[in-house]
Amino acid sequence: MIAMNTPDFQRMKKDNKKISMVTCYDYWSACIISQSNVDCILVGDSLAMVMYGHSTTLPATVEIMAQHIQAVSRGAPNKFIIGDMPFCSYRKDLTTSMNAVERLMQAGAQAIKLEGADAHNLKFIHHVVKSGIPVIGHLGLTPQSIYTLGGFKVQGKEPSAAKKLMADAKALAETGCFAMVLECVPSELAELITHSISIPTIGIGAGPATSGQVLVLQDLLGTNNQFQPKYLKKFLNGFELIKKALDDFDQEVKTSTYPHLETHCY
């Protein structure tokens, strides 16, 4: 039984209880998360970068997303799972875009997430919500628009940009999103948006006043020692711990310490 549902997001904001979300891409990681207190899981299109080594999220496809959603849903059947709509999958004709939504939902997602709030997206979100499918919005740094934005940069620093973000947030809430991600926006702006809309905000690089926080599992575990954006706290030095385990294995194999005849052999 899934421990969380869409009304819980609204209730938690109303009760001033923070929402914890972790981005996860695979079965074994999901198994661990399933035993944790983390509220929900995002299967993000960032898997194109984290799992496949691309420099952007753009190479993620609907089929790749569906495969990873299936793996995560098998590992964490008790968690609320959000699936990212990948690059251009919701910018096509309505039938094709809805086929993409259907694929992700049938793969095991309980909701979808998409980036931006232009007229096309708002119309599509309205249709998806009216179809009975929960939607999370995403504003601020929207990685699928990385070439338009000019890189991975903080958004909403200028007054005009901040005003637009506020308007977009209100539009997403009014269109029917049940929550939204705010990525890499100034803390004060994120706080204003959070207090100005009825739905919860999930921050990443958006300060402490959002309704919750999301981090990529590999980032919070510190498995990439080359990645240290300002917003990231590494809750474990995973890189060094994993490297040490590998070096210890290598050493024991080469010294014939492992496998031990009495302990590890049949």
Swiss-Prot record:
It is found in: Cytoplasm. Keywords: Cytoplasm, Magnesium, Metal-binding, Pantothenate biosynthesis, Transferase. The keyword RNA-binding does not apply. The keyword Transferase applies. The active site is at residue 183. It is an enzyme of class 2 (transferase). One of its GO terms (cellular component) is cytoplasm. Catalyzes the reversible reaction in which hydroxymethyl group from 5,10-methylenetetrahydrofolate is transferred onto alpha-ketoisovalerate to form ketopantoate. This is 3-methyl-2-oxobutanoate hydroxymethyltransferase. The gene is panB.
